[in-house]
């Protein structure tokens, strides 16, 4: 079953496929406390359900399917149990989508911009991640991270984010395993993983970053369940293809069009 990687018990929407909302990284290791200053945690009702990426002092990039009511955003967080001194909390001031927030039938526009209710300041554990200056190349070694599940078969969630290196693959590698979904021949989606399996994002990791060449190149979107199966890589929204839309929204052009 394809999984939208968000915590199942938080899903109110009737989805035709499962996205990685609340996926944990599988096959990785605990992230170094200083390597994820841009990583944010999305909470609702005290439950961490998605990740996101701080792209400047006022804006967070995440997946559209991570949209829920009463979102709280934690920045500068490492351990869920032991707060950093410079942790900050925000709530959304505005949210922007390429699609209606309730429409997930187009697999390649799973993207949401959140404007924070007030800007954050850079600190020891908070700093934005650069948007891409060019698209990533197939074969690139990329890195993804999150507080999602760390077991493909058990509901095991970590206290601190886990990081894993995966490879950028041909899009067809994500399209071929799922003929029943009739995915388009071309897509604004990146395909990434390890073909032999064992390394992947998972439930709870949705919305988190795929980092290639030190830039925010992808947004964790969907993948198979169980996670980390051989020849079942995961899909990430391609940030570069949405760059004009992102920059227009941030500049105040809220009527900006999404890429076709």
Swiss-Prot record:
Enzyme class, broadest EC rank: hydrolase
Gene3D superfamilies hit by this protein: Trypsin-like serine proteases
One GO MF term: serine-type endopeptidase activity
Enzyme Commission number: 3.4.21.-
PROSITE patterns in the record: TRYPSIN_DOM (PS50240), TRYPSIN_HIS (PS00134), TRYPSIN_SER (PS00135)
Any one Pfam family match given in the protein's UniProt record, by short name: Trypsin
Propeptide: 19-24
Tissue specificity as recorded in UniProt: Expressed by the venom gland.
Disulfide bonds: 31-163, 50-66, 98-258, 142-212, 174-191, 202-227
Signal peptide positions (record): 1-18
Glycosylation sites: 103
Record's GO cellular component terms: extracellular region; secretory granule
Keywords assigned by UniProt, alphabetized: Disulfide bond, Glycoprotein, Hemostasis impairing toxin, Hydrolase, Protease, Secreted, Serine protease, Signal, Toxin, Zymogen
Catalytic residue positions: 65 (charge relay system), 110 (charge relay system), 206 (charge relay system)
Family annotation (InterPro entries): Peptidase_S1_PA (IPR009003), Peptidase_S1_PA_chymotrypsin (IPR043504), Peptidase_S1A (IPR001314), Trypsin_dom (IPR001254), TRYPSIN_HIS (IPR018114), TRYPSIN_SER (IPR033116)
Limits of the Peptidase S1 domain: 25-251
GO-annotated biological processes: proteolysis
Compartment annotation: Secreted
Family affiliation: Belongs to the peptidase S1 family. Snake venom subfamily.
Stored PANTHER family: KALLIKREIN-1, KALLIKREIN-RELATED
Annotated function: Snake venom serine protease that may act in the hemostasis system of the prey.
Oligomeric and partner information: Monomer.
Protein name, per record: Snake venom serine protease pallabin
